[in-house]
């Protein structure tokens, strides 16, 4: 990704990483990810954030091109996570007169990552929530966004061009060069938000309230494309996701964790019964689908069926992983149906119910499907009852 002119004074110097397979060592990114960084060229030229260590050399080349002989006055640190902060010490060494701007927690974490000698005390500019920094014809106002999704996070609002530098907010998986402006921004933004930030809905709501007081024309996130045009659709998505409201209240996810295929087969039979009743259904085989996609679909749908085999008296691990992730991400306000399978001692429904009981505002259907080895007439009758209950909830 080469230097991108966002305006005559604001340039993007980020890097696309198309060789990474797992973001944060766990989330598949088949189209890569971008590490975004920005430069404001003014009387006091300013860099906003660095990039991951995987992208250092390309980023430095982009930065050199964007600076065009200028020496940066400031580095703004929005977020200390290593995919954005990895090159702080290197940049500070390259430009020994440059000052580093952050808040008290920023510098606490900076010392933990790099040691206090990386950025000397007299080079640190510690800002408070709402304070501003004049760069010449541009002014940055710092808006703290704690736990979106780390404690030190702050966003920066540039008032003359009405640009919000939003840290990880409004980020998206996928390399920017591969993003089609006509494509569905929400698909990988949704998966990014729900798996990275999803736990912190109240904190995102607090940030959205602060952002509502700002006149924003452009959003510059630390991952994904720069957002322009109708920003309302992006803000509406964030409001919905952070309020834990389903995008499609009547849509049903049928997620199965099957050892030898019988539970998956039963889940498909139930899905077909739901479709016959007019329901919109998506099926996911948890043994073949990364959990991040299942988490995303569970949040998107208003209703979910969890179909799981009993395994050594516990849940089959793919289902256990899904429930653990859902609980971690604050899954709530949904309707769930349960299906279990066990040849001699089916336990999955009881165990799944116990996990769901620890989540907020969950409605668990009264009808439960219990399969002993394979589907029979009794199990089909239970499926009919569960399907009827789900479509009428």
Q: Where in this protein do the model-derived segments appear?
A:
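Conserved beta-strand hairpin/beta-sheet module of binuclear metal-dependent hydrolase folds
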Residues: 3-65, 155-158, 162-165, 263
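Metallo-beta-lactamase
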Residues: 4-8, 101-153, 200-206
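Active-site neighborhood of phospho(di)ester-bond hydrolases with catalytic His/Asp-centered motifs
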Residues: 48-50, 72-80, 99-103, 164-168, ...
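Active-site metal-binding motif and surrounding structural segment of the metallo-beta-lactamase
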Residues: 54-101
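Short acidic active-site motifs
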Residues: 87, 290-294
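FMN-binding flavodoxin-like domain, especially the glycine-rich phosphate-binding loop
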Residues: 176-180, 184-219, 223-226, 269-284, ...
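Short N-terminal or domain-adjacent regulatory/targeting segments
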Residues: 220-248
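Short, charged N-terminal beta->alpha structural module
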Residues: 255-277
């Amino acid at each position: 990704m080469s230097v991108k002119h966002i305006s005559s004074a604001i340039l993007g110097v980020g890097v696309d990483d198309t060789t990474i397979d797992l973001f944060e060592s766990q989330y598949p990114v088949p189209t890569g990810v971008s590490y975004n960084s920005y430069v404001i060229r003014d009387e006091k030229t300013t860099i906003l954030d660095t990039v991951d260590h995987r992208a250092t050399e390309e980023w430095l080349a982009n930065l050199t091109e964007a600076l065009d002989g200028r020496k940066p006055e400031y580095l703004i640190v929005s977020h200390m996570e290593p995919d954005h902060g990895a090159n702080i010490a290197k940049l500070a060494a390259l430009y020994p007169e440059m000052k580093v701007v952050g808040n008290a927690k920023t510098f606490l974490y900076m010392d933990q990552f790099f040691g206090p000698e990386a950025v000397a005390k007299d080079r640190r500019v510690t800002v408070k929530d709402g304070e501003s920094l004049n760069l010449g014809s541009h002014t940055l106002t710092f808006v703290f966004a704690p736990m979106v999704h780390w404690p030190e996070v702050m966003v920066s609002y540039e008032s003359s061009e009405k640009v919000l530098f939003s840290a990880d907010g409004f980020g998206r998986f996928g390399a920017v060069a591969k993003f089609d402006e006509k494509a569905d921004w929400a698909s990988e933004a949704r998966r990014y938000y729900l798996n990275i930030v999803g736990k912190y809905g109240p904190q995102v709501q607090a940030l959205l309230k602060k952002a509502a007081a700002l006149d924003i024309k452009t959003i510059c996130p630390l991952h994904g494309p720069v957002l322009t045009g109708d920003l309302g659709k992006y803000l509406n998505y964030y409001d919905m996701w952070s309020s834990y409201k389903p995008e499609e209240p009547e849509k049903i996810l049928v997620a199965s964790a099957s050892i030898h295929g019988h539970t998956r087969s039963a889940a498909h039979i139930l899905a077909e019964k739901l479709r016959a009743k007019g329901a919109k259904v998506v099926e996911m085989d948890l043994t073949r689908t990364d959990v991040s996609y299942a988490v995303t679909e569970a949040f998107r749908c208003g209703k979910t069926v969890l179909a799981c085999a009993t395994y050594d008296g516990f849940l089959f691990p793919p289902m256990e992983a899904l429930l653990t992730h859902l609980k971690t991400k604050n899954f709530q306000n949904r309707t769930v149906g349960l299906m279990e399978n066990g040849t001699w001692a089916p336990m999955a429904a009881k165990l799944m119910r116990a996990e769901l009981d620890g989540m907020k505002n969950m409605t668990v259907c009264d009808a439960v499907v219990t399969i002993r080895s394979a589907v029979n007439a009794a199990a089909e009758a239970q499926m009919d009852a569960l399907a009827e209950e789900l479509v009428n909830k």
